[in-house]
Each structure stands twice: as structure tokens, then as C-alpha cells.
Amino acid sequence: MKLTTQRIDPDLVRQVTILATIIGSIVINTISNFFPPDGVDMATLSDRLFPSVQILPANYAFAIWAPIYLGLIAFGIYQAQPTQRHNPSLQRGGYLLVFACISQCAWIYLFLARLFPLSVVAMLGILLPLIVLYQRLEIGQHHVSPTEQWFIQIPISIYLGWITVAIVVNAALALYSINWGGWGITPAIWAVIAIVVSAAITTLVTIEHHDPAYLLVIIWALIAIGIRHLDTPLITVTAAVAAIFLILLSVDAPKPVGKDS
């Protein structure tokens, strides 16, 4: 009598793993916000330890995590459907989102543990997989169905947009934590440099991908930076000009071409 073994579909494993990792990362983030170590959440910790870091956005900006996690839940549920098991776009994405979510959990622990330089490494662990995933999904480069746009592309665009800003802020906090002198350049000037670099990166992404979701997240962050630092006109004006420029750029950016995928 022969024993037969049924091969598990690797795409099914991927679907389950992605959904489980998304749920796990949201649970960990929620616990860290409502029951943080020592009763100090991330926003409060940043305010207490980094009052002089002038690239920090206003606290309301962190509400962006609500649509980020809502989008990830939508992504997780959508990709887990049997009809999406062999979706070429999702197959190309592989386990990249899993790596990003795991790194997100690591970042939360490291930041709350005040291991700020190591938290930058974890943030890179979020950013790099998201960049590769963004490229593999070819977001904004081809027309796709509205369903795929809302449940696959937009969640990744919003997540990547915020992490693009967050890693700049995180790096600034890490440097401050080790008493980096800034090479004699004032914090306000460094903030302006960071804003300009962020706007330049966003310009390149917008020209190549014409991705309104990514663009709006950056604009949201720039406005929040300007509002937090109203007492420093140089930062506020630079952030406002950068935001206006990106808004105008979004109007003239090239539209995606190609067949539906």
C-alpha cells in the first residue's frame, strides 16, 4: 500500500504567512501604543528626548498609521482570497511584505528600548523590502483594475511613502542620541536639507510612477513638519514651498501607460 503525500501549494503558504504577519504586526503596534513599557509611548518618548530635533513632524501626522494599517488589512484579506492565489503581481511580491512587517515589529522594540541607532537598521529593514515590492508591482507604471489599485497598490504606496519620511526622521533622532554635532551646521539647516532631499526623492518617484497615494503621504508629512516648527520660519517656509511644488508636480506628472495587468 502506497502512502501518498499531498504537496502544499507554496502560493497558499505565502498567502497565509502574509496575512498572519500583517495581523501580528498590527497587534504588536497596538499593544506598544496602549501598553508601552514604562507607560511611555513612542510619541511621548520622542517629545521628551528630542525637543531640539527640527525634522520631527507634528504629532497628528502619526495618525497616518491608521490608513496604513487599514490598507495592510485590506491587502492581507484581498491577497488571501483563493481567486488571488496565483495572481502574477502578488507572486512577484513574494515575502517582501512579510520582511517589512517583521522589521516593523523589531523597530518598535528597539525604539521603545531607546536603542535608536539600531532602530535605524530596523527601519532600513522596512524600507528596502518595500522599495523592491513597489518596483515589482510596477505601481503607477501600468493601468490596473480599480480593485487591484485599491487593495494592492495603494496600501503599499501609503506604507512606503511614510517610511520614506520616517527613516529620515529616525536617522536624525539616532544622530541626536549619540550627541552628533552636525559638523557645525545648525539643526534648522539640517531640517531644510532633509526636506529638500525628501522632496527631490518624491519628485523622482512621481515622474516615474505618477503615484498620487505616495505623493499625498509626503505632502502630509511636509505640512506636519512645517506646522510643528512655526517658530522657525526657515523650516516652515521650506516645508510649505516643497509641499506646494509637489502638489503642482502631481498635476503635470505623466500618466501611466500600457495595458491593464
Regions from the PLM with identified roles:
Residues I22-V40:
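Alpha-helical transmembrane segments of multi-pass membrane proteins
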Residues R48-I64, Q149-S157, W180-A191, H229:
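Short aromatic-rich membrane-water interface segments that cap or initiate transmembrane helices
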Residues A213-A224:
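Central hydrophobic cores of alpha-helical transmembrane segments
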Residues P10, Q81-P82, Q135-H142, S250-S261:
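Membrane-interface capping segments at transmembrane-helix boundaries
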Residues Q6-L19, W65:
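N-terminal membrane topogenic signal
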Residues A106-V120, I178-I185, L204-H209, H229-L234:
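Membrane-interface helix caps and helix-loop-helix hairpins in membrane proteins
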Residues I73-Q91, V98-V120, L124-P146:
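Internal transmembrane alpha-helix with an interfacial aromatic "cap," most often the third helix
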Residues A20-I28, L96-I108, M123-Q135, I152-N170:
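Alpha-helical transmembrane segments of multi-pass integral membrane proteins
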